[in-house]
């Protein structure tokens, strides 16, 4: 009887060893998706196209800047390549203007973004006046912010100007009946960097 029991137990052990064990191939917390991974592509576009105005070596200069951002509720970021002629003027004066671009002034904005102030006098491309904070304000821009530079954060190849907004000027046609800014009327030109394309708001 004892031999029979031992034989049965031995047979069970052999059978259990011969049964293949399936590996757990399920990876928890990984969701299947049909989205394509584009790597570390910077894709925060389109952005409002702006023309930055500043005084450089005693003369007004204009520069198209597509890399701008909001910091908190009273600061903006203006990110500019270190190679730009305008940077030194901003560093010296610690002030600049940020002018939004409408369709009407897009050709002139495109021009000032394609030539350097180091070799071309761009001071008279736009009709302008000097704002209350001493920066050049484009008359035909639908909205302009005069800013003071409160800090400069340098990254590889770029000067990143942290700016406090001092004055904001808006054209009458972009205001509502209460004199407040109406963003549905503003409709600035947008800029898309990878293909250097201009887009119309809402289109």
Predicted feature locations:
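C-terminal motif of bacterial Sec signal peptides marking the signal peptidase cleavage site
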Residues: 15-16
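Sec-dependent signal peptide recognition
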Residues: 2-8
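Short linear, low-complexity motifs centered on an aromatic residue
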Residues: 1-2, 127
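Basic, polyanion-binding surface patches
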Residues: 21-203
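A ubiquitous, low-specificity "background" feature that marks scattered single residues
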Residues: 8-9, 184
């Amino acid at each position: 009887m004892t031999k029979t029991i031992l034989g049965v137990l031995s047979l069970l052990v052999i059978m259990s060893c011969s049964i293949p064990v399936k590996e757990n191939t399920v990876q928890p917390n990984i969701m299947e998706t049909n989205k394509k991974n584009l790597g570390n592509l910077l894709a925060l576009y389109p952005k409002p196209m702006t023309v930055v105005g500043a005084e450089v070596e005693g003369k007004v200069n204009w520069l198209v800047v597509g890399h701008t951002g909001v910091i908190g509720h009273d600061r903006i970021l203006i990110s500019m390549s270190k190679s730009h002629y305008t940077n030194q003027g901003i560093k010296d004066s610690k002030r600049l203007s940020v002018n939004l671009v409408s369709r009407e002034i897009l050709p002139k904005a495109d021009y000032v973004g394609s030539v350097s102030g180091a070799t071309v006098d761009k001071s008279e491309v736009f009709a302008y006046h000097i704002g209350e904070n001493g920066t050049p304000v484009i008359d035909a821009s639908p909205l302009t912010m005069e800013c003071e530079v409160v800090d400069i954060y340098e990254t590889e190849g770029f000067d990143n100007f942290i700016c406090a907004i001092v004055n904001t000027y808006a054209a009458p046609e972009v205001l509502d009946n209460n004199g407040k800014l109406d963003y549905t009327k503003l409709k600035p030109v947008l800029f898309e960097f990878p293909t250097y394309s201009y887009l119309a708001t809402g289109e």
